[in-house]
Amino acid sequence: MKRYGMVIGVRPEKVEEYKRLHAAVWPDVLKMIQACNIRNYSIYLRTLDDGQPYLFSYFEYVGKDFAADMAKMAADATTQRWWSFCKPCQKPLANRATDEWWVSMEEVFHAD
């Protein structure tokens, strides 16, 4: 199992819409998350001192090929449709890698 932390901005005028979407995630999206070996998935919201709201996600990956599982998720028509509602709410960080939407974070501490 590998733990992942990721961050992305959220457009201030879209915070309530994003929260509404995630209060009722589509069942097929949840099934795809499970099918792609993601467990214990949470998203947190916080407005920082710069006034910008950010989303922090945490999940545990239990599969053997993260890239293949993420490609499987990205190819799923229902997931693509879900993302078409979520992405306009998000504001990617300027310093993200070319292939990133959410920015990966470095784990600096963990305790069970």
Locations of regions flagged by a protein language model:
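Short, glycine- and small/hydrophobic-rich beta-strand elements in well-ordered beta-sheets
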Residues: 30-56, 60-66
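Short amphipathic alpha-helical segments
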Residues: 14-39
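Charged phosphate-binding loop/patch that engages nucleotide di/tri-phosphates or the phosphate backbone
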Residues: 96-112
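An amphipathic, aromatic/His-enriched active-site/gating alpha helix that lines ligand/cofactor pockets
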Residues: 36, 60-101
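Active-site-flanking beta-strand signature of metal-NTP-handling nucleotidyl enzymes
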Residues: 4-9
